């Protein structure tokens, strides 16, 4: 029984030392109590992530956007669609009107070289 308890203690000690060695190899000592040679930055990664998300999503920082009137936005969107359709119709109608105006105001000219016209 004494042999079994001794081997169990040595086995646990070996397991603990191997895990400590593996953690220190990965860059973070297992048994350190927080007093490190190089102290951590002011904000840890766990603190930086929510702060970054809040900064990138300005809706959380500005409570004035919380009461946006949704029906007015829908009406603005409808007006913009109508304006876009009107613009596209006007844009497609412009070249045909321009060609009609050019043909009526200027007679067709023949190609001439010096005094010989074709």
Swiss-Prot record:
Residues 28-108 form a propeptide. It is found in: Secreted. Expressed in a number of tissues includinf brain, thymus, spleen, testis and spinal cord. GO terms for biological process: blood vessel diameter maintenance; regulation of blood pressure. The keyword Methyltransferase does not apply. GO terms for molecular function: G protein-coupled receptor binding; hormone activity. One of its GO terms (cellular component) is extracellular region. Disulfide bonds join 112-117. Keywords: Cleavage on pair of basic residues, Disulfide bond, Hormone, Secreted, Signal. Residues 1-27 form the signal peptide. Potent vasoconstrictor. Belongs to the urotensin-2 family. This is Urotensin-2B. It comes from Rattus norvegicus. The lineage of its organism: Eukaryota, Metazoa, Chordata, Craniata, Vertebrata. The gene is Uts2b.
């Amino acid at each position: 029984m004494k042999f079994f308890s001794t081997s169990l203690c040595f086995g646990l000690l070996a397991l603990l030392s191997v895990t400590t060695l593996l953690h220190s190899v990965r860059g973070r000592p297992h048994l350190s109590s927080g007093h490190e040679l190089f102290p951590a930055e002011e904000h840890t990664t766990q603190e930086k992530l929510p702060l970054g998300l809040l900064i990138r999503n300005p809706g959380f920082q500005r409570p004035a956007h919380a009461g946006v009137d949704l029906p007015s936005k829908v009406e603005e969107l409808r007006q913009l669609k109508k304006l876009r359709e009107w613009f596209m119709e006007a844009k497609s109608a412009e070249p045909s009107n321009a060609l009609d105006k050019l043909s009526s105001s200027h007679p067709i000219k023949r190609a001439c070289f010096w005094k010989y016209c074709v």
